[in-house]
Amino acid sequence: NCMALCEHVLAMAISDGWDNFFNNLQQIRYKDGIIGMRTRNHYTMADWLPENSWILEDVSRKVGGEYTKSVTRTISHKKFFTSKGIKDMRYVLPDREITIEYVPLDALEEVEKNIRPGDIVALIYTNKTDVFSAHMLIIAEKNNKKYIREANSKKATTFDTPYKEWASNIQDLEDYLGLSFMRVKEELDVPGKVILPWEISKLKSKARSGSK
């Protein structure tokens, strides 16, 4: 699915072999790398991005500039897990009111120049009160032209759409507000950069302390 695509691409980009890939994938996909339904980073903007702040940063405002807007919603893990038939609520986070930033759909063509290949994108719902992200995508570039890369779960593959075409096609869809943008941190966005699994704890500590 869309989140799995982004997780796999991110993990492969920082790994030098399959062993490191699977370890890094585990760190990206689960809180503190602990495999489990309740430790999975289910919510893109409330879980996945914050838990991966050691490698990613929210660049929605950098991309959107003056067009950037914000939206606040309450995220309930308890409600989510209850809907999945899970009764054991140990280690489940309490309900949280979270505010995120996004670039409105009608500004997407204006901000294309600020988007980089490799940016991870979340498509934000309009009317949902308990979730932000409807879909995750990746910005790709071929022959100096930007594309939106998406996962097709039914066909178990990916497909690319020219960015301008994608942005134009989505303008009239009232279900969505806009896009939030995530980007690999500058100091880690180095060709051939490998992050070993045991280095991640230091990067997480650095991210939590706010140090550079």
Describe each model-derived feature in a short phrase.
Residues 1-98, 116, 123, 144-145, ...:
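Acidic/His-rich structured neighborhood in mature extracellular/periplasmic domains
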